[in-house]
């Protein structure tokens, strides 16, 4: 005898199976959450595969918790763990998760790519109990060449977005991140810089619409959320205003031929002199040219302890090598770029080159969605308004040679970045910025040497204060740094807020207070509902 089972009855049946299978020691909170999901979600799903908890399966829970975490410093046994991890399969599940977390007084942490530098997408030091809503299953990307746009769901990585664009066209791209495993949900909400920023601005500058879930569990698009909230979510930092479900992004034109190169200089090859020249011209180069500098200690010989400083100039040029060589000869001959240093390729292959993939890798490698580099690390950031003098660089090299595995990456500004108002979106670092610095200290032995490395990067950061932006000393919110202050700390939010957002911080606070007055979406450095 044939019969039909409704979606709701099927879901109830699955819930019953789940609750039967959960040991008695399992969290009652998870059971209550599951029941609430059924009452508030109208789409059935394999619920047993959408939850991960230590009571059900400690091994799977650990694997899921660690699956996308970029900073291993926050995966030690002493770090707080969520009661469970929930992976929504549909947008209505996200709505229900917000409603149920609010009802059960559970704190939410939202994770798309897991790249938060201070682990705020998967660790909550001051909020218990907390759960993670992991958006990695919401990863559809729909490209529409007729409108030069695409809808990208929050769980998609930047690499997936790039891949789906090039599936449809070899002459369209999107100006976002250099690291292909970044989740686009959290990436764009912090601004999102990349190798085409000098030509087209930030990723957030090229957002046309968005879909979010607010603190009441409602799905809102740009029209429904209003222009103030739409302004706030494009650079105002993750975890403050709602759950990003999807972004509508504007595609940009890219040439059929893109040229890349990497040229490395050391101290023995007049590296400091060449870098000082780069500081003076990097923001003034042709808008099609992006040259970043990756700086770290390197061995001069095979003898241990015999180290120098390596400065690798890595570039993407939106054009062929002949035109690139003309630009370089005119603007930066000191680098000594030659034809054999240059490699012509498609835009998608240039994205992979910058991200660190081997030349032999096919574009499908972008779909893996896993980070190529994981470490214990501490990061900081700076913006530079005047060239750092040679003596300042030499002092920096002395400090770098004292540390095991330091790294700094200098990204040029100028071009379109200087032509967009600093209040256009919350990201304010625009005209007058020569370049942005990312500081990193990395290590592999966990807690054993953490204190030493943290001490080093803080002292180095203090040394560099004299050479970087002032009043305020600016920072990039996607390089989250809790040393700047927290909502529960002694530092006034206006101090760290001004570092990230400058004069835009007060507007963000006003919007937050009106849109999420109960501060449901919060973390250690979220935008507060009020200040002072």
Swiss-Prot record:
Sugar attachment sites: 57, 306, 431
GO biological process per UniProt: embryo development ending in seed dormancy; polar nucleus fusion
Keywords associated with the record: Cell wall, Disulfide bond, FAD, Flavoprotein, Glycoprotein, NADP, Nucleotide-binding, Oxidoreductase, Secreted, Signal
Tissues expressed in: Expressed in sepals and stamen.
Main location (coarse class): secreted
Disulfides per UniProt: 36-100
Annotated localization: Secreted, Cell wall
One Pfam family hit: FAD_binding_4
EC number(s) from the headed UniProt entry: 1.1.99.-
One annotated GO molecular function: coniferyl-alcohol dehydrogenase activity
UniProt cofactor(s): FAD
Knocked-out gene: effects: Endosperm development arrest and impaired polar nuclei fusion.
Bound cofactor: record note: Binds 1 FAD per subunit in a bicovalent manner.
Catalytic activity annotation: (E)-4-coumaroyl alcohol + A = (E)-4-coumaraldehyde + AH2; (E)-coniferol + A = (E)-coniferaldehyde + AH2; (E)-sinapyl alcohol + A = (E)-sinapaldehyde + AH2; 4-O-(beta-D-glucosyl)-(E)-coniferol + A = 4-O-(beta-D-glucosyl)-4-(E)-coniferyl aldehyde + AH2
Superkingdom of source: Eukaryota
A single Gene Ontology CC term: extracellular region
Residue ranges of domain FAD-binding PCMH-type in the record: 76-254
Similarity-based family: Belongs to the oxygen-dependent FAD-linked oxidoreductase family.
Function: Required for endosperm development and polar nuclei fusion. Mediates oxidation of p-hydroxylated derivatives of cinnamyl alcohol (i.e. the monolignols p-coumaryl-, coniferyl-, and sinapyl alcohol) to their corresponding aldehydes. Can also use the beta-O-glycosylated form of coniferyl alcohol (coniferin) as substrate, but is much less efficient towards cinnamyl alcohol. The electron acceptor required for these reactions is not known, but does not seem to be dioxygen.
PANTHER family associated with the record: OS08G0158400 PROTEIN
Record's protein name: Monolignol oxidoreductase AtBBE-like 15
Source species of the chain: Arabidopsis thaliana
Source organism phylogeny: Eukaryota, Viridiplantae, Streptophyta, Embryophyta, Tracheophyta
Gene that this polypeptide is encoded by: MEE23
């Amino acid at each position: 005898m044939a019969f039909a089972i409704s979606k709701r009855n099927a879901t109830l049946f699955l819930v019953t199976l789940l609750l039967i299978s959960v040991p008695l020691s399992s969290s009652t909170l998870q059971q209550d959450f599951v029941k609430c999901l059924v009452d508030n979600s109208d789409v059935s799903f394999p619920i047993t595969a959408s939850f991960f908890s230590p009571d059900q399966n400690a091994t799977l829970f650990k694997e899921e918790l660690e699956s996308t975490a970029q900073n291993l410093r926050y995966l030690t046994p002493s770090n707080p763990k969520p009661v469970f991890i929930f992976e929504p399969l549909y947008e209505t599940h996200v709505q229900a998760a917000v409603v149920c977390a609010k009802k059960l007084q559970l704190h939410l942490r939202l994770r798309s790519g897991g790249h938060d530098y201070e682990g705020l997408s998967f660790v909550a030091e001051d909020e218990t109990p907390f759960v993670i809503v992991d958006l990695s299953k919401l990863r559809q990307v729909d490209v529409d060449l007729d409108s030069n746009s695409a809808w990208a769901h929050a769980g998609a990585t930047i690499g997936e977005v790039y891949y789906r664009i090039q599936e449809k066209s070899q002459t369209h791209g999107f100006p976002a991140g250099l690291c292909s495993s970044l989740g686009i949900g959290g990436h764009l909400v912090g601004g999102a810089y990349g190798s085409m920023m000098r030509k087209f601005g930030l990723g957030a500058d090229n957002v046309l619409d968005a879909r979010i879930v607010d603190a009441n569990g409602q799905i809102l698009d740009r029209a429904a959320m209003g222009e103030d909230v739409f302004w706030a979510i494009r650079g105002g930092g993750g975890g403050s205003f709602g759950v990003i479900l999807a972004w509508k992004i504007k595609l940009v034109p890219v040439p059929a031929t893109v040229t890349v190169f990497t040229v490395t200089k050391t101290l023995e090859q007049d590296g400091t002199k060449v870098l000082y020249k780069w500081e003076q011209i990097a923001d003034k180069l042709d808008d099609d040219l992006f040259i970043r500098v990756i700086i770290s200690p390197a061995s001069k010989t095979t003898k241990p302890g015999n180290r120098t400083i390596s400065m690798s100039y890595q570039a993407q040029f939106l054009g062929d090598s002949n035109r690139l060589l003309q630009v370089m000869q005119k603007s930066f001959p000191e680098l000594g770029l030659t034809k054999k240093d240059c490699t012509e390729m498609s835009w998608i292959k240039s994205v992979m080159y910058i991200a660190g993939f081997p030349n032999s890798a096919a574009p499908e490698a972008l779909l893996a969605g896993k980070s190529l580099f994981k470490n214990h690390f501490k990061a900081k950031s700076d913006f530079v308004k005047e060239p750092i003098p040679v003596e300042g660089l030499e002092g920096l090299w002395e400090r770098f040679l004292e540390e095991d595995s330091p790294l700094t990456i200098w990204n040029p500004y100028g071009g379109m970045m200087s032509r967009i108002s600093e209040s256009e979106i919350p990201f304010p670092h625009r005209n007058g910025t020569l370049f942005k610095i990312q500081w990193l200290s990395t290590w592999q032995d966990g807690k054993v040497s953490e204190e030493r490395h943290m001490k080093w990067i803080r002292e180095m950061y203090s040394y560099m204060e004299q050479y970087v932006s002032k009043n305020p000393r600016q920072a990039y919110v996607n390089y989250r740094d809790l040393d700047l202050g927290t909502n529960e700390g002694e530092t006034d939010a206006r101090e760290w807020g001004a570092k990230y957002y400058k004069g835009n911080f007060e507007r963000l606070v006003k919007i937050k207070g009106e849109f999420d007055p109960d501060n449901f979406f919060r973390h250690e450095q979220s935008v507060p509902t009020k200040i002072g």
